Amino acid sequence: MKLTCVVIVAVLFLTAWTFVTAVPHSSNALENLYLKAHHEMNNPEASELNKRCYDGGTSCDSGIQCCSGWCIFVCF
């Protein structure tokens, strides 16, 4: 019973600590996200959504080309 209470208190503390330390960066993160989206609108070739990848069963040279990221001569 005591161990359960200690675990619950520890989880609550760590959750609260995560929120407390994340607050100063949240506005900055939204600003960076907006700037990135604006840059992608001006330069569509830089968008992550335009990157092509191969489906499973397609021959490949590296894992970067595969949608799954796994390549051993064939995408998995």
From Swiss-Prot:
Residues 23-52 form a propeptide. Belongs to the conotoxin O1 superfamily. One of its GO terms (cellular component) is extracellular region. InterPro entries: Conotoxin, Conotoxin_omega-typ_CS. It holds the Pfam family Conotoxin. Residues 1-22 form the signal peptide. Its main location: secreted. GO terms for molecular function: calcium channel regulator activity; ion channel inhibitor activity; toxin activity. Keywords: Calcium channel impairing toxin, Cleavage on pair of basic residues, Disulfide bond, Ion channel impairing toxin, Knottin, Neurotoxin, Presynaptic neurotoxin, Secreted, Signal, Toxin, Voltage-gated calcium channel impairing toxin. Disulfide bonds join C53-C67, C60-C71, C66-C75. It is found in: Secreted. Expressed by the venom duct. The presence of a 'disulfide through disulfide knot' structurally defines this protein as a knottin. The cysteine framework is VI/VII (C-C-CC-C-C). PROSITE patterns: OMEGA_CONOTOXIN. This is Omega-conotoxin-like TxO3. Omega-conotoxins act at presynaptic membranes, they bind and block voltage-gated calcium channels (Cav).
